[in-house]
């Protein structure tokens, strides 16, 4: 088998296809009373079971053609000014709404023309098309009419896809509108996500026009939350007063109702007296003055505080920004890809972000100074020495990083002492032992001591101030050897080898061990895994992953170890699995949007806002 990460190699083994050619050298139908083999056997009934994969699609296509030609149609839907011809049985099979209409005792069950009110005619046509084609495009221009129409017709799949589209559109300027829309149409999951987004990004949301237009009830719902992400309670007070002063004449009557949910006892004494207590609107309202006095007593009488505890004295506890994992580039279905996606363990969702400017498989990925670096790789035609850098706050890649001194694919990349190291790989001519490091302050690469062994498909890890180069291939065969670099001495030394030869393995530091998983040995892709204890200089096995994975990414996110993508010997993988060290077990936990072999992974803190997701303004539902 060829190396699946090298250009020109399919990565496909002999597999089951090779076994499909019989082994006897003879052929026959098995029918009739011809010859026998060995002992006499009783005749078996002739049977061939077949399930057509084409049949559902072909049938839908033909039914849709009948509809388009208005043949065998037995109902006409009058929606707005439009007449939509259809077949009752198709509508009833797809929609509980139509099933109840046409199979019960309703008057419509006996009518050939049915008028449906309170639904957008364009949305209805799209939904009827979906019933016949299983295909729909949800986009910004139609989602607000599609969702209520899907709710009316009880098309749950379309409701879900509309909610998914709106989740991807969330940003601080529209999250309140999406929240209200979700509430109106009883989309609980979208409402929950919009609520969390609003709480998490409150400092940006409070500056939006949507915030100033909130009804008083929704404003109270938001500022009541313990999860509100603010630096201090002063921000909540300022937000409330901005909302009030947007329309003082109508809103001043609600000031006390709203102010009771601002945690005035948590304000600084200076702000409470100088800003809140001196505000003319606050001073003119007796209930507001009582709230200010309550806060003053709390601040002035610390010995009485145990008796004064309540919702207004409880500090807010916003959810901390967790870590997220980025999957970068790789090899998918026979080609290098530039796509990048982000995994959030809190929601278990993969979202697309901005792609790189170049396709890169065998790319090295690491995070330095809160920026994600993609180093080298192969674009399907050429070996690369270029580098791209991703800023999650702007969702943009830049190409202003100095290139490495040589082209590298299947390269190991890691960060040590503020430098970005590129280790081994191959340049299209030979397997490399070269090592160089990047200084972000100087935007410059410089060579350091080479490894003692040439290594492509090498895994690298940083532990206790040392850089480890683990496994890989010397260009002839996979390696189990490991060496360690000391930057103070600029020297590589060997440490104990792994128990298994591995190239294109995944590697990460977890709980002060170096974990090495998957890869490929001389014969096959591996699911086995082991870990290195630097204190004893020993490797010990752990339980194998659920899948064989060569070209796998391995990373620690929020204290959990994730294995991402790879190649199992017959297929590129988009599955991920997570390891539990207490139970010594791996479990599958979702899928990426893209299959990835030889993609890089990097872990960063989640950005302050979620408004950077890379997606088209449309969401296509078709054979997903």
Swiss-Prot record:
Residues 1-21 have a biased composition (Low complexity). InterPro entries: BACK, BTB-kelch_protein, BTB/POZ_dom, Kelch-typ_b-propeller, Kelch_1, SKP1/BTB/POZ_sf. Residues 73-140 form the BTB domain. Keywords: Actin-binding, Kelch repeat, Repeat, Ubl conjugation pathway. Residues 22-37 have a biased composition (Gly residues). Residues 175-277 form the BACK domain. It comes from the Eukaryota. It comes from Drosophila virilis. Kelch repeats lie at residues 324-370, 372-418, 419-465, 467-512, 514-559, 560-606. GO terms for cellular component: Cul3-RING ubiquitin ligase complex. This is Kelch-like protein diablo. It holds the Pfam family Kelch_1. One of its GO terms (molecular function) is actin binding. The keyword Protein biosynthesis does not apply. Pathway: Protein modification; protein ubiquitination. Transmembrane segments: none annotated. Probable substrate-specific adapter of an E3 ubiquitin-protein ligase complex which mediates the ubiquitination and subsequent proteasomal degradation of target proteins. May have a role in synapse differentiation and growth. One of its GO terms (biological process) is negative regulation of synaptic assembly at neuromuscular junction. Residues 1-55 are annotated as: Disordered.
